[in-house]
From Swiss-Prot:
Gene3D superfamilies: alpha/beta hydrolase. This is 2-hydroxy-6-oxononadienedioate/2-hydroxy-6-oxononatrienedioate hydrolase 2. It holds the Pfam family Abhydrolase_1. Belongs to the AB hydrolase superfamily. MhpC family. GO terms for cellular component: cytoplasm. The gene is mhpC2. Catalyzes the cleavage of the C5-C6 bond of 2-hydroxy-6-oxononadienedioate and 2-hydroxy-6-oxononatrienedioate, a dienol ring fission product of the bacterial meta-cleavage pathway for degradation of phenylpropionic acid. Residues 41-277 form the AB hydrolase-1 domain. The lineage of its organism: Bacteria, Pseudomonadati, Pseudomonadota, Betaproteobacteria, Rhodocyclales. GO terms for biological process: 3-phenylpropionate catabolic process.
């Protein structure tokens, strides 16, 4: 019996895989989770927080997609979780896009839908610009392009706390960051804090390399504003009204620029829409993917 027959069996451990990739000068061992066996594949790309991973970011969203008949691949970006460490001196968005291309080539996937949260959204747009024929649909939450906000001074409150946590990875700093990460921090449990802290501290090399990367290049995420018109894939842009990491005007920039994009804004929602409003998010994503089915 495979995972698509028995979604309850899905877990981080049961779906854990590794792939060696070579994409140009980039040679890396990447970790990913591979769930289900549908004809269409949805790739999920996580954000840049300390201790982040594909599974930690999207564990509330995998089972509904698999149950609906999709194969789901969650890539741990270079420098996170069980993937190889790296110091990034250029565009982190483009590094992750190259890594994704290498992973898709390694596991024999051509065209995919991509869901990207925060950094994952930036990376999804970078991938779509470099590989337009390999993208079905895009779902972007709290990310898609770097660049300044017209709403709030940069860096934002959340990004300052995130960078502080990388430099001083303590449970106190983690709680400070998570308190502004979501709209309602009362939903965060001590178990969640501890799991995230354990993930962070298990890979001190990733934390140190992120700080080194920022010192070399403080602008890790490319501003794709001038090129958004080239992203013609159907795109669903999702934002939290109360996002204190990436302000809502970034979502407006995306739909102004991308010709086939639509925007949904969740009230009472921070930077983690797929977790904070998981049920509504899952229904919305499935509805969007099933419009004009067979686009792959």
């Amino acid at each position: 019996m495979n995972d698509v027959d028995n979604p309850v069996s899905l877990s981080d451990l049961s779906t854990s895989r590794f792939a060696e990739i070579q994409e140009g000068d980039l040679r890396l061992k990447l970790h990913y989770n591979d769930c289900g066996s549908g004809a269409e594949t949805v790739v999920m790309l996580h954000g840049s927080g300390p201790g982040a991973s594909g599974w930690a970011n999207f564990n509330r969203n995998v089972e509904p997609l698999v149950a609906a008949g999709y194969r789901v691949v969650l890539m741990d970006c270079p420098g996170w979780s069980k993937s190889d460490p790296i110091v990034c001196s250029g565009s982190r968005s483009e590094l992750n896009a190259s890594a994704l291309k290498g992973l898709l080539d390694a596991i024999g996937l051509d065209k995919v839908h991509i869901i990207g949260n925060s950094m994952g959204g930036h990376s999804a747009v970078a991938f779509a610009l470099a590989n337009p024929s390999r993208v079905g649909k895009l779902i972007l939450m709290g990310g898609g392009t770097g660049g300044p906000s017209q709403f709030v001074p940069m860096p934002t409150e959340g990004i300052k706390l995130l960078q502080g946590l990388y430099r001083e990875p303590t449970i106190e700093n983690l709680k400070k960051m998570m308190a502004v990460f979501v709209f309602d921090s009362s939903s965060l449990t001590e178990e969640l804090y501890q799991a995230r802290l354990d993930n962070m501290m298990s890979r001190r090399d990733h934390l140190e390399n992120f700080v080194k990367s920022l010192a070399i290049n403080p602008k890790q995420f490319t501003d794709y504003g001038p090129r958004l018109g080239e992203v013609t894939a159907p795109a669903l842009v999702i934002w939290g009204r109360d996002d204190r990491f990436v302000p809502m005007d970034a979502g407006l920039r995306l739909i102004w620029g991308m010709p086939n994009a639509e925007l949904h804004i969740f009230n009472r929602c921070g930077h983690w829409a797929q977790w904070e409003h998981a049920d509504k998010f899952n229904r919305m994503v499935l509805g969007f993917l099933k419009q004009s089915e067979g686009s792959l």
